[in-house]
């Protein structure tokens, strides 16, 4: 099955798993997904993730979700830049998500990073998603 938005698919799987109170969720692996998960792990939105390679050349990522007192750590996770409508911002116009309580994940020339890192490095890029 071909997906038009693999990153959006991963975010939807995470959102649905949190809604069903699952402890983990799996998704096909890609470099972009792995880099986004690195940011989510560093910011404390997921517990961990691991990649499994199969004999047929494909690989899968198992994401361990994080809860605090039984409630999901992630309240809202949404794709911003979509295949039909890309959203680019300069370093000065990176939005503050939920008045600074959430993060935006950007794809920049210096790699995939959280919004506060992009502001520190004075680099703009494509807003991939927002997490609160």
Curated annotation (Swiss-Prot):
GO terms for biological process: translation. One of its GO terms (molecular function) is structural constituent of ribosome. Keywords: Ribonucleoprotein, Ribosomal protein, RNA-binding, rRNA-binding. One of its GO terms (cellular component) is ribosome. InterPro entries: Ribosomal_uS8, Ribosomal_uS8_CS, Ribosomal_uS8_sf. Pfam families: Ribosomal_S8. Gene3D superfamilies: 3.30.1370.30, 3.30.1490.10. It comes from the Bacteria. Belongs to the universal ribosomal protein uS8 family. One of the primary rRNA binding proteins, it binds directly to 16S rRNA central domain where it helps coordinate assembly of the platform of the 30S subunit. Part of the 30S ribosomal subunit. Contacts proteins S5 and S12. NCBIfam families: PRK00136.1. This is Small ribosomal subunit protein uS8. It comes from Mesorhizobium japonicum (strain LMG 29417 / CECT 9101 / MAFF 303099).
